[in-house]
């Protein structure tokens, strides 16, 4: 059911109405019989657009709705806004303070009197004028309360208040209100408001009526209403025509339909977001399950197979490996690794594993090489398989901890570092003495590391370093550097890696880890020096070349960054061409970083070449050897 009253005058001087007046309707809603939920309301702002009238000579309306409280009901009751009774300037009327711009009248208010009533003589005088008519709203409801307000214009030019009648019963009918104009006597220079009202303002101001005829005809004819007014003005009841009610009903139905459409659209969008979230959560769970799967069964026949089997489906082998039957593939792979030819090293290690799936050392070097070739996911799978075959492989544990750190699996990184201490003959007694430490032996997932777990593992490493005294264990210092990196203590991590480098100054992987920690600590210039040193030792170290390009981007050296990315891609492709490998292990991360650098250089044609993967065009553009 709808019930509403809309009348607002916007005056130039004294109360002059115009055709572009703003109408504000406060929508109040009630649920249940004989009660009203004052805490649920909908506010709507409606503005008339001048100079564009419809066929019925009604100004076109644009409407926007806003949810005042948390829930929007489907059948609102329209009630006038408290703002309609506010005066912009000083008034002699005694008004009650209003604390909200869109306050809602509650059933506890029997009367809202904002100004003194006008005199009866003035009302009758104005009533006699044909251009100024009064109107009323007749409510048909049983046992309903009635709220009436009157206002008078006095003193300085004011906004003209309105007289309204609210029926709080849910079974009500909205009927027509004509313009109710109250004119007060003026205190200065005797300017009556009736003389300042023009005929254009009377004809330009249009009424907007709302109706919701949901009751049967007997209810409409059998109801009674009372008009409780404390003003001296007389309200004339005007019965609306059936055609007008039908039109008003269409307007109300259109508003309800629009509200329902907005609600349905919101629900559809919400469902889509929830569906996307569930999809990615499921994908994440599947990826984690895949990473933990037993890749090779203990079946002896499966171990002797040379082809790719279902037991090895967690790691994606190259299907056209030219070295699949190469004798001594593992030794040849180690030779290529020393030369810095990472893509070919990967092919030889895969061939060695296909020849002997239980070769833990081949899995170890395959994982380490994949990480250096900027393929972290494949590295994690290979290192996990190595540890399944050889749980005390310390190099694999440390490399796995680094890969977990790079992929954001901080809890798993802590677990791997703790297992490194546990499997190390020199330090495993420390774990036994701290057997009660919480959370150190549980399987972890991709989430921010628990502070208690991280601190517990750091205590183990610090105690082990203290036991060593002046002797520096580079592997222990490397693990300590990773732990400090996880906790964001980059300066302490830098100290740990530098300590390890004092023992292994030619370890290019340590120089790369030092550079990454410097870069994460906002020391990109020093990081460039560390990466450069790593590349001097191992020119084919693709990961360090990629990291160097990232630091160049951070320093604003975009051309140098592009040059490093192209060099890394060229190394991967050159190795493939020499060995006639149709599908090289080229990292998508490098292409993504290359596109970022090219976009920062404002080179759209080169950016398009990067999108197409046209490496030759890019190499020629930067004068690099193919």
Swiss-Prot record:
<comment type="subunit">
    <text>Interacts with RAB8B. Forms an obligate 4:4 complex with HCN2. May interact with the C-terminal PTS1-type tripeptide peroxisomal targeting signal (SKL-type); the relevance of such interaction is however unclear. Interacts with HCN3. Interacts with HCN4 with a 4:4 HCN4:PEX5L stoichiometry; reduces the effects of cAMP on the voltage-dependence and rate of activation of HCN4.</text>
</comment>
<feature type="modified residue" description="Phosphoserine">
    <location>
        <position position="205"/>
    </location>
</feature>
<feature type="modified residue" description="Phosphoserine">
    <location>
        <position position="445"/>
    </location>
</feature>
<dbReference type="Pfam" id="PF13432">
    <property type="entry name" value="TPR_16"/>
</dbReference>
<feature type="modified residue" description="Phosphoserine">
    <location>
        <position position="261"/>
    </location>
</feature>
<dbReference type="GO" id="GO:0000268">
    <property type="term" value="F:peroxisome targeting sequence binding"/>
</dbReference>
<keyword id="KW-0472">Membrane</keyword>
<feature type="repeat" description="TPR 6">
    <location>
        <begin position="543"/>
        <end position="575"/>
    </location>
</feature>
<feature type="region of interest" description="Disordered">
    <location>
        <begin position="118"/>
        <end position="167"/>
    </location>
</feature>
<keyword id="KW-0597">Phosphoprotein</keyword>
<keyword id="KW-0677">Repeat</keyword>
<protein>
    <recommendedName>
        <fullName>PEX5-related protein</fullName>
    </recommendedName>
</protein>
<feature type="repeat" description="TPR 1">
    <location>
        <begin position="326"/>
        <end position="359"/>
    </location>
</feature>
<dbReference type="GO" id="GO:0043235">
    <property type="term" value="C:receptor complex"/>
</dbReference>
<feature type="compositionally biased region" description="Basic and acidic residues">
    <location>
        <begin position="181"/>
        <end position="198"/>
    </location>
</feature>
<dbReference type="GO" id="GO:0005829">
    <property type="term" value="C:cytosol"/>
</dbReference>
<feature type="modified residue" description="Phosphoserine">
    <location>
        <position position="257"/>
    </location>
</feature>
<dbReference type="GO" id="GO:0005052">
    <property type="term" value="F:peroxisome matrix targeting signal-1 binding"/>
</dbReference>
<feature type="compositionally biased region" description="Low complexity">
    <location>
        <begin position="225"/>
        <end position="235"/>
    </location>
</feature>
<dbReference type="GO" id="GO:0005778">
    <property type="term" value="C:peroxisomal membrane"/>
</dbReference>
<feature type="region of interest" description="Disordered">
    <location>
        <begin position="1"/>
        <end position="20"/>
    </location>
</feature>
<dbReference type="InterPro" id="IPR024111">
    <property type="entry name" value="PEX5/PEX5L"/>
</dbReference>
<feature type="region of interest" description="Disordered">
    <location>
        <begin position="181"/>
        <end position="235"/>
    </location>
</feature>
<dbReference type="GO" id="GO:0016560">
    <property type="term" value="P:protein import into peroxisome matrix, docking"/>
</dbReference>
<dbReference type="Pfam" id="PF13181">
    <property type="entry name" value="TPR_8"/>
</dbReference>
<comment type="function">
    <text>Accessory subunit of hyperpolarization-activated cyclic nucleotide-gated (HCN) channels, regulating their cell-surface expression and cyclic nucleotide dependence.</text>
</comment>
<comment type="similarity">
    <text>Belongs to the peroxisomal targeting signal receptor family.</text>
</comment>
<dbReference type="InterPro" id="IPR019734">
    <property type="entry name" value="TPR_rpt"/>
</dbReference>
<feature type="modified residue" description="Phosphoserine">
    <location>
        <position position="253"/>
    </location>
</feature>
<feature type="repeat" description="TPR 5">
    <location>
        <begin position="509"/>
        <end position="541"/>
    </location>
</feature>
<feature type="repeat" description="TPR 2">
    <location>
        <begin position="360"/>
        <end position="393"/>
    </location>
</feature>
<keyword id="KW-0802">TPR repeat</keyword>
<feature type="repeat" description="TPR 3">
    <location>
        <begin position="395"/>
        <end position="427"/>
    </location>
</feature>
<dbReference type="GO" id="GO:0031267">
    <property type="term" value="F:small GTPase binding"/>
</dbReference>
<dbReference type="InterPro" id="IPR011990">
    <property type="entry name" value="TPR-like_helical_dom_sf"/>
</dbReference>
<keyword id="KW-0963">Cytoplasm</keyword>
<feature type="modified residue" description="Phosphoserine">
    <location>
        <position position="447"/>
    </location>
</feature>
<feature type="repeat" description="TPR 4">
    <location>
        <begin position="474"/>
        <end position="507"/>
    </location>
</feature>
